[in-house]
Amino acid sequence: MGNTFGHLFRITTFGESHGGGVGVVIDGCPPLLEISPEEIQLELDRRRPGQSKITTPRKEADTCEILSGVYEGKTLGTPISILVRNKDTRPQDYDEMAQKYRPSHADATYDAKYGIRNWQGGGRSSARETIGRVAAGAIAKKILRQVANVEVIGYVKRIKDLEGVVDPNTVTLDQVESNIVRCPDGELADRMIELIEQTGRQGDSIGGVVECVARNVPKGLGEPVFDKLEADIAKAVMSLPASKGFEIGSGFAGTLLTGFEHNDEYYIDENGEIRTVTNRSGGIQGGIANGENIILRVAFKPTATIRKEQKTVTREGEETLLAAKGRHDPCVLPRAVPMVEAMVALVLCDHLLRHHGQCKVL
């Protein structure tokens, strides 16, 4: 239960951190889409561990294998299965955590729900589960580009109290990928990297905010009431490990404005299209895309597994102390960027297919 996401473009992820591998099955991908393992690998490389000095030192190539659904470089319209095998596992690092719960991790809640858990690396609750999401997101991104020239770009907006100045309307992928923290504000990026390194040396962790923009989203994507576009995006990104907050457009800052100040006034552009002067709605009104850029932010908490000693309890209910071992990110934000992009792309791709299926038939 809870392992499948989407309606027409639907994914099911599988696997655990220290099991044989992780992956995804994608249902509903249109046939005849040209896709290669290399295109998927580009996205996986952006989220893989061990990519820089500020990420987990776990060394995984995360090489993807397309097992089904693609023939001679084109999708068949049948389920696409993608597998990434785990290579650099160290289950012995987690022996102590078989009995001791990590504070603010999923250990205790998984035990409460299932009565059993794979304690090696967090099992299913590990961020390695997101490999399947990012692989599927690579395919969703290609569909969006090919059909509607949609581009989805995420970046680190804030690390702890360091907040970058970035224009979501003009930011480019090259700017995002110009440094290891994935903050397009180059000057602040250096300070972010230094802060992450310093925190990691102290055996601690920090969080922050990823901002994401989707440009050229067709007007009309989204559904009324329960399947509003922003509601589906919120569910998608809030299902990511360590996510703790979501806002779109003006977000919580919009509560400080009056209606006159907040409303996005309309005008007709040079092509005769209805546009808005401002974009405090974040590209969505009434749950439906209005053609402006969709701009959202996701808050990620500090990584739960840290080397500093903390109070905790055992499975048997005894109070104890834990200084966690293992290899963990001192800050999840740099690797969370492609995860957020993937989830936004999956939602937009699903709604694109739903919109065409209902509103482009007659």
Swiss-Prot record:
Residues bound to NADP(+): R47
Leader sequence residues: none
Pathway: Metabolic intermediate biosynthesis; chorismate biosynthesis; chorismate from D-erythrose 4-phosphate and phosphoenolpyruvate: step 7/7
Gene3D superfamilies in the cross-refs: Chorismate synthase AroC (3.60.150.10)
GO molecular function annotations of the record: chorismate synthase activity; FMN binding
Record's keyword terms, sorted: Amino-acid biosynthesis, Aromatic amino acid biosynthesis, FAD, Flavoprotein, FMN, Lyase, NADP
Catalytic activity: 5-O-(1-carboxyvinyl)-3-phosphoshikimate = chorismate + phosphate
A single BP term in Gene Ontology: aromatic amino acid family biosynthetic process
Binding-site residues, FMN: R124, S125, S126, G286, K301, P302, T303, A304, T305, R327
Stated family: Belongs to the chorismate synthase family.
Quaternary structure and partners: Homotetramer.
NCBIfam families per record: aroC, PRK05382.1
Record's function text: This reaction introduces a second double bond into the aromatic ring system.
Protein name: Chorismate synthase
Native source species: Nostoc sp. (strain PCC 7120 / SAG 25.82 / UTEX 2576)
Lineage per the UniProt record: Bacteria, Bacillati, Cyanobacteriota, Cyanophyceae, Nostocales
Gene designation: aroC
